[in-house]
């Protein structure tokens, strides 16, 4: 698929087809694309935990997501959580390289997730990134260690609807040339 078309087609989907499934090979292809994202000093701190059976997805959603995200992700074939493991943006002696400090881990996670969702779309899958979730419940449900910081929860599956493209700002709205 042409890259520009891919960017234009990708949407946050809030209605998934529960009859369609995602294969292990598709999940691996998506994560392989995510791995290609750049990271601070090549630290590669992003980690994923994937719930791949309908029963686990349903149980996770009920325990870890607010009601509106449970509804929005219903029917998704899988749910993936993205974490930042350890720290990035620091020198070997532990001082921050700049004012962003460990924020680089989240920045890198965002780059990873962008690759993740675009590759999913290229494979014909759809996604919904959910930022509102119960971090404590997720840690308990997936036995996540304290040195991993939750960044995103992503529902993955096949769209049951085709939503309109949301209005975007223009280049003139966001770009200043000097």
Give the residues covered by each predicted segment.
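Helix-loop element at the rim of GNAT/NAT acetyltransferase active sites that forms part
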Residues: 13, 36-37
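A short N-terminal beta-strand-loop micro-motif at the entrance of redox/enzyme domains
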Residues: 13-29
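Glycine/small-residue-rich phosphate/adenosyl-binding loop
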Residues: 26, 39-109
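Small-aliphatic-rich amphipathic alpha-helix that forms the alpha element of a beta-alpha
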Residues: 34-35, 80, 86, 95-141
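Short secondary-structure junction motifs
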Residues: 43-46, 125, 151
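Short active-site-adjacent structural elements
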Residues: 89-91, 137-139, 161-165
């Amino acid at each position: 698929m042409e890259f520009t078309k891919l960017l234009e087609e990708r949407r946050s989907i809030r209605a998934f087809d529960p009859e369609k499934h995602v294969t292990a090979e598709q999940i691996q292809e998506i994560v392989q694309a995510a791995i290609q994202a750049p990271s601070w000093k090549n630290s590669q701190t992003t980690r994923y935990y994937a719930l791949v059976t309908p029963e686990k997805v349903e149980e996770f959603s009920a325990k870890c997501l607010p009601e509106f995200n449970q509804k929005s992700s219903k029917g998704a074939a899988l749910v993936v959580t993205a974490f930042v493991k350890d720290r990035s943006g620091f020198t070997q002696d532990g001082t921050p390289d700049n004012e962003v400090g460990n924020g680089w881990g989240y920045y890198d996670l965002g780059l990873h997730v962008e690759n993740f969702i675009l590759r999913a779309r290229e494979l014909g899958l759809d996604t919904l990134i959910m930022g509102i979730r119960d971090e404590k419940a997720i840690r308990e449900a997936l036995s996540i260690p304290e040195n991993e910081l939750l960044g995103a929860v992503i529902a993955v599956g096949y769209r049951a609807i085709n939503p309109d493209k949301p209005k975007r700002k223009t280049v003139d709205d966001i770009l200043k040339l000097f």
